[in-house]
Curated annotation (Swiss-Prot):
Subunit structure: Homodimer.
One term under GO cellular component: cytoplasm
Protein encoded by which gene: aspS
A GO BP annotation: aspartyl-tRNA aminoacylation
Keywords: Aminoacyl-tRNA synthetase, ATP-binding, Cytoplasm, Ligase, Nucleotide-binding, Protein biosynthesis
Subcellular localization: Cytoplasm
Official protein name in the record: Aspartate--tRNA(Asp/Asn) ligase
Phylogenetic lineage: Bacteria, Pseudomonadati, Campylobacterota, Epsilonproteobacteria, Campylobacterales
Pfam families on file: GAD, tRNA-synt_2, tRNA_anti-codon
Enzyme Commission number(s) from the entry: 6.1.1.23
Native source organism of the sequence: Helicobacter pylori (strain ATCC 700392 / 26695) (Campylobacter pylori)
Residues the entry annotates as binding L-aspartate: E171, R217, H444, R481
Amino acid sequence: MRSHFCTEISEKDVGKIVKVAGWCNTYRDHGGVVFIDLRDKSGLVQLVCDPSSKAYEKALEVRSEFVLVAKGKVRLRGAGLENPKLKTGKIEIVLEELIIENKSATPPIEIGNKHVNEDLRLKYRYLDLRSPNSYEIFKLRSEVALITRNTLAQKGFLEIETPILSKTTPEGARDYLVPSRVHEGEFFALPQSPQLFKQLLMVGGMDRYFQIARCFRDEDLRADRQPEFTQIDAEMSFCDENDVMGVVEDLLQEIFKAVGHTISKPFKRMPYKEAMENYGSDKPDLRFELPLIEVGDCFRDSSNAIFSNTAKDPKNKRIKALNVKGADALFSRSVLKELEEFVRQFGAKGLAYLQIKEDEIKGPLVKFLSEKGLKNILERTDAQVGDIVFFGAGDKKIVLDYMGRLRLKVAETLDLIDKDALNFLWVVNFPMFEKTENGYHAAHHPFTMPKNIECEDIEEVEAHAYDVVLNGVELGGGSIRIHKEEMQKKVFEKINIHEEEAQKKFGFLLEALKFGAPPHGGFAIGFDRLIMLMTKSHSIRDVIAFPKTQKASCLLTNAPSPINEEQLRELHIRLRK
């Protein structure tokens, strides 16, 4: 039906007869001469038709988004009529034949216009997908999936599918449940991850497994979250952290070659505690400096009770400083006020600072500091004339969080971030357990191997866990797993999953661990998030063919939707009014 895609045609084809197919992107009638911009997956090419052409009458019928097949001769555009914005901007096709394969209603959205209301774009997603930019996103997505399969297959991994209808298990989010028609009152759960099945594959001697897995989590959505998503999932037997990290680094190196990036290995590694203390995040963006600096001891003799009391409890509280070089000339009073309002959103009670002037130091903290304390702060933060040093004080978790966010906010405000840089990082030595209102729970998941389970302070127990971070975004992570029944039971006890509950929820896993489970570990990389970063897309919804909204609904199909009484009866379900 066609000889070329639109953007395959160039000056070398001048004089040739070509056949192209696609949609009418724009239609113009200039004094009897008709111009049509034809669009296909590759981009645009201009068709031109004057009254002398036998295709002219048909060309007059064309409107936006009509489906066309066009045949004609390639020629150079006239002098001064070239379009440098188009790949085909130097040529045009003089129409000889034109077929209207299908007409179109007036489109409710402009194809390729990202400023159109997103709900409208999602409702008419099949139109939104027609833009060449969308095609390039899904072309890359397909290429990355193929690279993943080829790379892991070369390393001896087998692609194995795990069940979608599974058992509900606690993994940090709510499960999507599927009622069983056959087993009245019982439910399947859609998998939040293939975690337990891939561990069972290792028990089964599969040695190295992977799949590009569909996962489901019923959780509150954010810009980078979806209720159903895809991850590159893998597991290895007889391995340690270094082995797993090596596979991930090799895989990411091959993947990023697809977009012309050469990334070096090994990636930098940073302990979790260092990441939190120095950057206020377990996924720090290292494309710029601005470290957080501990200055608690400088406030021990401060006359400000809030700061001095905080300084006396270094286990649970923190005083962090952030020196922003040259900020005094760049940050007006209104900007400082905006930054204070920003950190208040995350639990700060205010934002103290010191402005380093030529002949004095200004700021609300100056009068509360001793001469020695002030001197130590200036030395430790390397504060020079023109700098502003910001301070956060209070509960450790809250301070690290809002000061880490302030660090990012300042970097964005001052344009300190190299948008083209790729800064990969491993964050390691995560805490095994986290405190909640109801005791402790597993920070990653309860199948992670702890490093020092006998430690008296449960909050100091570390996990054989690791996250891979790119430019401040968690790409994925993994861990070495527990492969002995006794250790698995011990971890369950630490998080108040006692024997009876453990058997009910995880009896099949505990049983499997009795039969010679090998040491094993693995990883998962968020596939959608990876493609979002590689394409510099604004939202994860841009890289999923038919995404859900932030309210977990599909505007295209109106899912979820009610079901009729007969279906409910078959499933033994009665709805409460």
